[in-house]
Amino acid sequence: MESQQLHQNPHSQHGSAYASVTSKEVPSNQDPLAVSASNLPEFDRDSTKVNSQEETTPGTSAVPENHHHVSPQPASVPPPQNGQYQQHGMMTPNKAMASNWAHYQQPSMMTCSHYQTSPAYYQPDPHYPLPQYIPPLSTSSPDPIDSQDQHSEVPQAKTKVRNNVLPPHTLTSEENFSTWVKFYIRFLKNSNLGDIIPNDQGEIKRQMTYEEHAYIYNTFQAFAPFHLLPTWVKQILEINYSDILTVLCKSVSKMQTNNQELKDWIALANLEYNGSTSADTFEITVSTIIQRLKENNINVSDRLACQLILKGLSGDFKYLRNQYRTKTNMKLSQLFAEIQLIYDENKIMNLNKPSQYKQHSEYKNVSRTSPNTTNTKVTTRNYHRTNSSKPRAAKAHNIATSSKFSRVNSDHINESTVSSQYLSDDNELSLGQQQKESKPTRTIDSNDELPDHLLIDSGASQTLVRSAHYLHHATPNSEINIVDAQKQDIPINAIGNLHFNFQNGTKTSIKALHTPNIAYDLLSLSELANQNITACFTRNTLERSDGTVLAPIVKHGDFYWLSKKYLIPSHISKLTINNVNKSKSVNKYPYPLIHRMLGHANFRSIQKSLKKNAVTYLKESDIEWSNASTYQCPDCLIGKSTKHRHVKGSRLKYQESYEPFQYLHTDIFGPVHHLPKSAPSYFISFTDEKTRFQWVYPLHDRREESILNVFTSILAFIKNQFNARVLVIQMDRGSEYTNKTLHKFFTNRGITACYTTTADSRAHGVAERLNRTLLNDCRTLLHCSGLPNHLWFSAVEFSTIIRNSLVSPKNDKSARQHAGLAGLDITTILPFGQPVIVNNHNPDSKIHPRGIPGYALHPSRNSYGYIIYLPSLKKTVDTTNYVILQNNQTKLDQFDYDTLTFDDDLNRLTAHNQSFIEQNETEQSYDQNTESDHDYQSEIEINSDPLVNDFSSQSLNPLQLDKEPVQKVRAPKEVDADISEYNILPSTIRSRTPHIINKESTEMGGTIESDTTSPRHSSTFTARNQKRPGSPNDMIDLTSQDRVNYGLENIKTTRLGGTEEPYIQRNSDTNIKYRTTNSTPSIDDRSSNSESTTPIISIETKAVCDNTPSIDTDPPEYRSSDHATPNIMPDKSSKNVTADSILDDLPLPDLTHKSPTDTSDVAKDIPHIHSRQTNSSLGGMDDSNVLTTTKSKKRSLEDNETEIEVSRDTWNNKNMRSLEPPRSKKRINLIAAIKGVKSIKPVRTTLRYDEAITYNKDNKEKDRYVEAYHKEISQLLKMNTWDTNKYYDRNDIDPKKVINSMFIFNKKRDGTHKARFVARGDIQHPDTYDSDMQSNTVHHYALMTSLSIALDNDYYITQLDISSAYLYADIKEELYIRPPPHLGLNDKLLRLRKSLYGLKQSGANWYETIKSYLINCCDMQEVRGWSCVFKNSQVTICLFVDDMILFSKDLNANKKIITTLKKQYDTKIINLGEGDNEIQYDILGLEIKYQRSKYMKLGMEKSLTEKLPKLNVPLNPKGKKLRAPGQPGHYIDQDELEIDEDEYKEKVHEMQKLIGLASYVGYKFRFDLLYYINTLAQHILFPSRQVLDMTYELIQFMWDTRDKQLIWHKNKPTKPDNKLVAISDASYGNQPYYKSQIGNIFLLNGKVIGGKSTKASLTCTSTTEAEIHAVSEAIPLLNNLSHLVQELNKKPIIKGLLTDSRSTISIIKSTNEEKFRNRFFGTKAMRLRDEVSGNNLYVYYIETKKNIADVMTKPLPIKTFKLLTNKWIH
């Protein structure tokens, strides 16, 4: 038979999209090659019919009805156009060319003996068309001898062989190839070649013989002309013209894909489910089919899927069909949930079902209903659920009723009672008989009703009938309201009785309701039970309580029915019943409709509005109000949901039975921020319910152990002290109370833990109110006493003692009296914060005072003493040795006895201490290391004595002022020794001792000259709190007409680097001093080194004690000439090195010397005072950072530091706001923000998977990212990144070893889109990597040095890139990652083999791998001290991860290295660097233009042009360009920044983004911007409007100068040596905390290769100390660079250091070791001497105006900035 000959695929899948989903006749398993007859041509259908018949007739009469076989005509079967075959199965060349088949001149490949053919087989040609039958290839035909042995195992016999085979029709078009190939395969199968045809998996059962190959080849040519074949077939045959099997294999695969849709539709249309398999399995099967169709672009809606599923449900699941019948919005997930629910319930019932059924007698008593109950006691289920093992009564859905006649408030009916339809079968069953049903069903529709029967409902409490024919004594319904399970009203027309006449004459009557709107007549078992009638479902009878059988009941379907023949009919007409209430209910609107129309208003509001005629065209009588008052709107219940109301006093009735100390309330408060570690951050309170006695315990944390210790203590205390046992503890649901440890503690002690409900804090009111009361007391006590905030718990404890002793308004006794304790002894209590003097029983010396000032806190718990706080010792003591200080002063400040020595003015300043911070605002500090809050801020009135002019007669005329204007200055928020200009204690300012300036003391910098960089009077001062003219605090305009010095103490300026600043003396004799020349340098020198010609008014900053020795560091020989350049000559070779040789070729500005300015008129040099309102320049901190005072002669520097330590504990009432709940506003303090800056947070420039692909709306970009994604996956698989042989279960692997992974996407600078699969190394566990391993990359200085040497030596520069570099490094640790998202393996893990990007160890692994390869295979050596710099005799390599830069004199040497690298790594040549013309590179972000032997230019114009506009900075491309990034004269305001939380985060993020980009550019090549970048980076966490404006100004300047480049020119070939020079500078005290800014610029052979601008790590007390610090920072890097240069280039090297500080040079040169101020700077100087002499370092002086390092340390005027930078960057 044909079915036996055809090859059947046992793995065939489901169908095609063309199948009808409603067809049930389609077989589930079809031949994948079969096609529908409707899709075939007419002659194909006929041939299909022929082939489908059984082989029971001879071949000569196989299909006599086919007219083609009777008289074949060429018209009906188109003859092949290929011509006749050759005798040996080959076409002749002419025939081949004629039929468009290529002749391959390889006849030997296909020659074979002519196989056996039947006489009926004719060679096809135009004159002899193909016959309708072709004899099959016989398996018994002789094979060649050599093939017989080869195929000896091939079966040689078939069970049945067909005599004739119907040939396929000839291919007529390319589109019909898929249909044609099906018939051709069928033809081959009928020719006994089915076992050599590949199936859909590409498998074959045996190899074909040579003869069979020729047969397939020839027949394929005969019926498939070459020019009609599809393109993909031609491509296969062009490669191998005889590879027909490949064509057939791919054709089968394509047909399988097409047929899969049909099979899926067939499977979906024929779904069946009866619960025999799990619901989960059924859901997975259906979901898989739907998902597969969706992947083929066929979307199956939820409604269609639900309909197909419901159609196949049976058994207990069939009822769902009726439930979903009327639904329009079907959800597939909801249907699956319903199926799962039924399946689970049936599973439980089957587990609980007894193994044996009871006998009939055993069920009798169980199933009978008690006559005294309202509801039946029969154990039955709702008809929604069934157990087919035994019959059950139906139970309808709840029907809520409200009636004075009803005994039960709910009735039960079917929710789908819509219409009444009857079965055709009207036969009543006999007693005890049950209708047989072929299949259990749960669907309740009209076909299930048993006509003329009542449905017995065990759940309904009322009987309902549709016909009034049986209703007796009917009365209109006026009060009964019935609703179904969906809360829909069921109208009741009438109320009456049903009269029954049972067997043996028993009559009874029950109440019934009439309604036509139900599907069945319902008989309530509850109503029957009231008449002592029960239903026995084991015998199917209605019985009396005594067992008398009244009537049989019938089981039909799943329900039990009682025949209506037992009902006595009435004579009331149906029309009468239906019209009983018609007059009352006609034309009335339902209340739910009006409720919705009027916006879900409440019942009373609607009714009252209608009564008052507030709504027109609607009357109160028009609405059906019958159930309006009880109507529950589901939308209102959801939308208007509220918490339950707490009735006042309701708690007491539940707790009256408890005795004292049996019921406790507890709660935890905290944390309190910004406290020292020794102070508690939390407290836990307890309150007894009966006595209201209170306890508080301090806590440092909320750990389980800490809480458990407190509970142990309180329980033991109550048990021992009050002889009581705690029974109940009420608390909230915080994790500190709900943990297992505490729960076990309560369980073991028999204590009931009473928790509040979710989000119900009012239920915990006792504890919450106590915490509020204690905190109110705490704030009040601390504010009154002025004590520091770390004593807050002492205030809480004091409040607890007092509250326990006072009578509350609700009680007639105090808590102590309720507890049986004595009242509080008032003589043992001191006011909180009462000043006392404590006896020091152990003084350090016999002559030291024995009294220590302190403050009383509270009575001691552990002794009869008192807890007293001692500020000087910063601790509390428990003592009775104290004396109360009787005065009216309560502030802590009054006990600093040094303040008593101050004058009256300073004492007046301490008279008041006002806070300018609102009480309710929240303080948040960013200093995580602050021990305590000292955010003191006060208004300080500076009112000095009138100034007396002390100018000579040649200068200004004196002018006496009656009174100095008063100016209020707000002190900085953070009081600290390093930042406070007044050394402020609360409300206290230390007295100032005038510092006398030596008239001869000037800066070492040459003669006095006028400022050549700016016009006279152009410099600006800026005073904070500057008033408009006319105000008392006006700034005085010091013009030439008004040249007096008065009120200068109100002028506040800051030191800008080395520029001399205004100096104000605090005595009456105030002089303005100017620079002179030829003075002795001193370590305490207050002078600076830049802009020496500008007359400056200087305010002294952190003066050193008068007894500090100064160093005469400048020998007489250096005082005689302003241009002397002292140098240090370490060895004899220094004779050939001069200052000119060091300064030669350096990019220093050319200065034109001018004659000294006439200084006879002092006022000419006093600049105007301007008030600039534009974007301010960078000038460091504001005036408060400069206005500092000298210390008293009575104290040394060490004493002052001790005093400041004490003041840090000083209380500021503003800090107690940290005890309050946080608010939406936050205040940012400048000092705290600067402390909080650790580093610039990198801004994310990459995209996640969802951003790049899933939700990317740019389709073009999305496609590029998808392409990059697949490229990355291919590369990962190629590199064997993970083990693909095994997937690991997530639960079996240690979580520490599991690394999260993700895809990141970005767009490279060249426009290509990149995808990278990376590991989340930021959350990698420390145990999974070796922290000692280092991931190294080339230092930027090393790259710049290599580029500079390449320019001077005409090197070729080659740029390479290694693809997926990290993946070449193996990983040693056992790590696992989650698979990529496209695999869909969320619960599986892959084991890593390679160092994936992002892992902590990947960089180190790759570094070790490439380092080993370069050393061992490329003969390279790594330069010591400079990682990732490798060299040999010819080539230098700089390595940055996967980027390599090669430098060589010979390009072939570079090529040799490239060849070696390509043997191991996928190496791409980015730029070979050949040629003598200008070559452009993009090396690590630098855009480099290089022309050998001439120049090199480094810039970032393209990158900045692309990136800067994306920063959302208001650039002004067409406006006036900025000429400098900032100018001196304006300062960053210290006023607190009050800002919303969200806005603050947004601005900080913006600052990070802007400064991050600026920093990247600055450290690459824009060294002239480093000062501004470094200063702004310190203010990232203080994003005030002013800081943002400064940042925008910097970005604007970068935009205006984006085309600037760092220019290098080749060194002169006449110079044989390399010259490495560092230029150093420092700006004294111009940074926060009076730190100095230091800067260094490094040059190699006159080319700037690097720069550094940073804040000094230590505070310097003079400009000389700052300069020493700057030089000490430059020398180590200078030595390291020297070593690198010598390794890369063997020329001799000269190292030079230039500074504009003569005193620093003198200190380095001097041998005097006795005059250093302290040990630190002494050792600094000594080390400098050693390094200079030991490293052949030449130190020379450079003029300040030529010092290009000035741009690293201070803001400069425009002309000065351009003058210092235009030689090396332009």
UniProtKB/Swiss-Prot annotation:
Segments for region (Disordered): 1-89, 360-449, 1005-1038, 1059-1135, 1171-1222
Main location: cytoplasm
Entry GO CC: cytoplasm; nucleus
Example of a GO MF term: RNA-DNA hybrid ribonuclease activity
Reaction equations catalysed: DNA(n) + a 2'-deoxyribonucleoside 5'-triphosphate = DNA(n+1) + diphosphate; Endonucleolytic cleavage to 5'-phosphomonoester
Gene3D superfamilies: Ribonuclease H-like superfamily/Ribonuclease H
Role of this protein: Capsid protein (CA) is the structural component of the virus-like particle (VLP), forming the shell that encapsulates the retrotransposons dimeric RNA genome. The particles are assembled from trimer-clustered units and there are holes in the capsid shells that allow for the diffusion of macromolecules. CA also has nucleocapsid-like chaperone activity, promoting primer tRNA(i)-Met annealing to the multipartite primer-binding site (PBS), dimerization of Ty2 RNA and initiation of reverse transcription. The aspartyl protease (PR) mediates the proteolytic cleavages of the Gag and Gag-Pol polyproteins after assembly of the VLP.
Full protein name: Transposon Ty2-DR2 Gag-Pol polyprotein
Species annotation: Saccharomyces cerevisiae (strain ATCC 204508 / S288c) (Baker's yeast)
